[in-house]
Regions:
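Twin-arginine (Tat) signal peptide motif
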Residues: 1-9
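Short, acidic, Ser/Thr-enriched surface-loop or helix-capping motifs
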Residues: 4, 73, 111
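N-terminal pre-ligand scaffold of iron-sulfur
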Residues: 10-86, 90-97, 124-143
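Short cysteine/histidine-rich metal-coordination sites, predominantly Zn2+-binding motifs
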Residues: 99-107, 117-126
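Active-site and channel-lining beta-strand-loop segments
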Residues: 108-110, 130
């Protein structure tokens, strides 16, 4: 009888310990190895009207399921880059006073050509093509 009780207690404790370990490991594994989300077959998006974005400013637009940083460099020049930092996939933002792209996660900076200026990002941002169609701004994938 005492032996059966010990076995039951051992079984319950090992089951509880296993459940505790799995409840900790599951979110860690999901974070480290996220599910692959199929990329939407989008080749271009209408990003808004020319007059919606003043010179020396930027906004983030959706390109399928990915964010793209659209920058109006001056009256006539436009740039667009992936808004995903090449270091750890944080969302980047445009710093108007410095005229640079900044990743707040680890203080990485990119210039207006998407090239790394400082910080930990290992490679430049992916660039997109910007075209004007009348008063509409259109962002297209590089081929």
């Amino acid at each position: 009888m005492a032996n059966e009780r010990r076995n039951l207690i051992r079984w319950l404790l090992s089951g509880g310990l296993t459940a505790s370990i799995l409840s900790f490991l599951y979110p860690v594994i999901k974070f480290v190895m996220p599910l692959a989300v199929p990329e939407a077959a989008v080749n271009e998006v209408a990003a808004g009207k020319v007059q919606d974005l003043r010179p020396h400013s930027a906004k983030i637009v959706k390109f399928g399921s990915r964010p793209v940083l659209l920058i109006r460099v001056n009256e006539t020049e436009w740039k667009a880059f992936s808004a995903i930092c090449t270091h750890l996939n944080c969302t980047v933002q445009f710093q108007e006073p410095r005229q640079q792209i900044w990743c707040a996660c680890h203080n990485g900076f990119y210039d207006l050509n998407g090239k790394v200026v400082s910080g930990p990002p290992p490679r430049p941002l992916e660039e997109f093509i910007v075209r004007l169609r009348g008063d509409e701004v259109v962002v297209t994938k590089q081929t």
